[in-house]
Amino acid sequence: MTLAGLSNSSTKSKSHLEVHELLDRFELLYDDVSELKDLRRAILDKDLSSIFRLSSAFAISSNGYLIDELRKSVLEENQYSILRLLEFYVNKKSLTTLTKTIKNFPKSNIKDAYSRGQLHSKKWLVSEVEKIGMHLGTVFLCAGWYGTLATMLFESEKIHLDKIRSFDIDPTCWQIAESINKPWVMDEWKFKATTQDIHSINFNEYTYKTLRSDKTERELFDKPNTVINTSCEHIENWQEWWNKIPNGKLCILQSNDYFELPEHINCVKDVSNFKSIAPMATYLYTGELMLGKYTRYMLIGIK
């Protein structure tokens, strides 16, 4: 069974997440929640010790009703019961919005956005930004796709920011990004996604048109403090784009050495190569993350 409730393989959408993928991704994202490992083992492996630990904990707490949800999860792999258990343990707004987004946008590529490589890369970024401890202010998220990084930044208890503006040239992205980040869209547009070529952005101060949920236009004005681009390998005319960013801006960049993909037109071979195409006055962090087929590189600094 899939998260979208589609059990027939011929009807599966690109956005569906199988039960094992759903459990794996949330265990990866929230590795500090030890019960998620028991939940995965109970549902996928029918591990008796895990089932016993979970059911015993429910029985002695005020959450005895969850025993029935656990039974349905283990015996039927009931998606709604699994989601209720995940909501109980994780207690994050993003779980509910992700579920609704998958149902409402069956043709989206949410499965790719929540791949292990994507989540590892973004979790790494969040971890290093937490260590640096700088207030991000207004964030311009370039090539923001479905805004999963925005969700992780908002949910971090150690990262402080004012708002996130996500820009992507793909017109199918903004509604999905806003669906996933709905709690922050509803909070006076603390999150807002816009269809925009990032080459046309003024990174000093930017007046631009965006769409409300009813698709009527509204003009916005923002002055970014932080520029994030985790898709540098996709950016055409890289130097032209990089030159648009003023000195003094906090920049967070990721690229990779996955040259084999034709859409990767701006890969780098190592951190030194990355620094040579994205020179900064001060580097606050440089590093790499091995991801099997390729290595991802990250630069955080003041241009």
Predicted stretch roles:
Residues 162-167:
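Short beta-strand element of Class I
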